[in-house]
């Protein structure tokens, strides 16, 4: 038996290391909640909502149970429902569509840019109909969408914008954070997000006090006051434990995003010019937060197998376009109708990235990708 220690795998994301870095603060915050005996709609949630709103450079944050609930409640708060249409990206996680469907409205898919994973405004305008009530851009992979162009379209056609910022905590567009200046933006605090908790969680941010008040009612059974129900709400409350954890992590978010950006720069430099590998593009006037570092190649499955054999974990975001998911069979456009989304689904591969990925691990990823690309080029 060999005495040489086996080389550890490069994890896609190390959630345990994130906890270990802040263990003392986190354990103290959890103990504080347990000792308080207050587990819902208490001071931790109030504190987090105020701090997250300030971080997003806006006035109000409303904590809810998940990112999808954040989207759904934002749409409901704007009065969107049956008979309405909402323009969504064809290339996104299915939650962006499901939130629209949950209101009774119809998601209308529009393609992304050919070289950037966010909505193409030139195609958005062609999809607007008299039934369109809102645009739902997704800041996918941590890259801000072209908000100026989308706002101009929304203003001209009298539409709402609901931003899906589930992957974009701290990202900036024209110097302002995502959520600043928007009518409403929805965030997820799923554990793997740039700002994640220890389970599910989400929040809606807005500068509109009336919308914020409606959202607070909707998340709490349609009630402002116990047993007085003004509308048909739901149960979607960010609990005190998760809020306490998020307050700790929010203070470290910019630092952790900075680590992600440094790793992305390492990847962009080390993988530049490789044949058959498309690298992510940063749009002008944007500061992405690199929730994911996603490359594109027509031989994606081969590259993924090669990296797996080299002890490197990867993921695919996302392998099945939403319009081809069985969940939308008979409702969404048929195969071949959204070629850009289908191209992304066929080609994308996300490499390990996160605030606790060490530089030597990133260099190991680069070496393995280069090895594969050069071998394929010579074949």
From Swiss-Prot:
Name one molecular function that GO assigns to this entry.
pyridoxal phosphate binding
- Supply one GO BP term: macrolide biosynthetic process
Asked if the record carries the keyword Transferase, the reply is: yes
Keyword annotations for this protein? Answer: Antibiotic biosynthesis, Pyridoxal phosphate, Transferase
Q: Does the keyword Transferase apply?
A: yes
Write down the EC number: 2.6.1.106
Q: Which SUPFAM superfamilies match?
A: PLP-dependent transferases
Q: What class of enzyme is it?
A: transferase
Q: In which pathway does it act?
A: Antibiotic biosynthesis
Coiled-coil stretches are none
Cofactor dependence: pyridoxal 5'-phosphate
Catalytic activity reported? dTDP-3-amino-3,4,6-trideoxy-alpha-D-glucose + 2-oxoglutarate = dTDP-3-dehydro-4,6-dideoxy-alpha-D-glucose + L-glutamate
Any Pfam family from its record, for instance, is DegT_DnrJ_EryC1
Q: Where does pyridoxal 5'-phosphate bind?
A: 67, 167, 188-193, 221, 227, 235-237, 318
Q: Which residues carry this modification: N6-(pyridoxal phosphate)lysine?
A: 193
Q: Note the subunit structure.
A: Homodimer.
The family note in this entry says: Belongs to the degT/dnrJ/eryC1 family.
Q: What does this protein do?
A: Involved in the biosynthesis of dTDP-alpha-D-desosamine, a sugar found in several bacterial macrolide antibiotics.
**PANTHER family per the record?**
3-OXO-GLUCOSE-6-PHOSPHATE:GLUTAMATE AMINOTRANSFERASE, TRANSAMINASE
Name of the molecule in the record: dTDP-3-amino-3,4,6-trideoxy-alpha-D-glucose transaminase
């Amino acid at each position: 038996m060999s005495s040489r220690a086996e080389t550890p795998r490069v994890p896609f994301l190390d959630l345990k290391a994130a906890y270990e870095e802040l263990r003392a603060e986190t354990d103290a915050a959890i103990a504080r909640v347990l000792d308080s005996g207050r587990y819902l709609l208490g001071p931790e949630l109030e504190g987090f909502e105020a701090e997250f709103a300030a971080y997003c450079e806006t006035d109000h944050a409303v904590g809810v149970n998940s990112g999808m609930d954040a989207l759904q409640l934002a749409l409901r708060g704007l009065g969107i429902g049956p008979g309405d249409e909402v323009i969504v990206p064809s290339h996104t996680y299915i939650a962006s569509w499901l939130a629209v469907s949950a209101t009774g409205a119809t998601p209308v898919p529009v393609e992304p840019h050919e070289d950037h994973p966010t909505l193409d405004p030139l195609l958005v305008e062609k999809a607007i109909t008299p039934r369109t009530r809102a645009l739902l851009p997704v800041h996918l992979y941590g890259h801000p969408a072209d908000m100026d162009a989308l706002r101009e379209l929304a203003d001209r056609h009298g539409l709402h914008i609901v931003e899906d910022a589930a992957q974009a905590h701290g990202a900036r567009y024209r110097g302002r954070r995502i959520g600043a200046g928007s009518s409403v933006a929805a965030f997820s605090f799923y554990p793997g997000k740039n700002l994640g908790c220890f389970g599910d969680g989400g929040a809606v941010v807005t500068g509109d006090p009336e919308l914020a008040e409606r959202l607070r009612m909707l998340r709490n059974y349609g009630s402002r006051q116990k047993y007085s129900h003004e509308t048909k709400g739901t149960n979607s409350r960010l609990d005190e434990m998760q809020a306490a954890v998020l307050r700790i992590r929010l203070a470290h978010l910019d630092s952790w995003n900075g680590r992600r950006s440094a790793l992305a720069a390492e990847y962009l430099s080390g993988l530049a010019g490789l044949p058959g590998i498309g690298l992510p593009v940063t749009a002008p006037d944007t500061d992405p937060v690199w929730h994911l570092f996603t490359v594109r190649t027509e031989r994606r499955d081969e590259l993924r197998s090669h990296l797996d054999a080299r002890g490197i974990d990867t993921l695919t975001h996302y392998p099945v376009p939403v319009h081809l998911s069985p969940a939308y069979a008979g409702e969404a456009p048929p195969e071949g109708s959204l070629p850009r989304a289908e191209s992304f689904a066929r080609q994308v591969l996300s490499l390990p990235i996160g605030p606790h990925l060490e530089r030597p691990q990133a260099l190991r990823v680069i070496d393995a990708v280069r090895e594969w690309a050069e071998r394929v080029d010579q074949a």
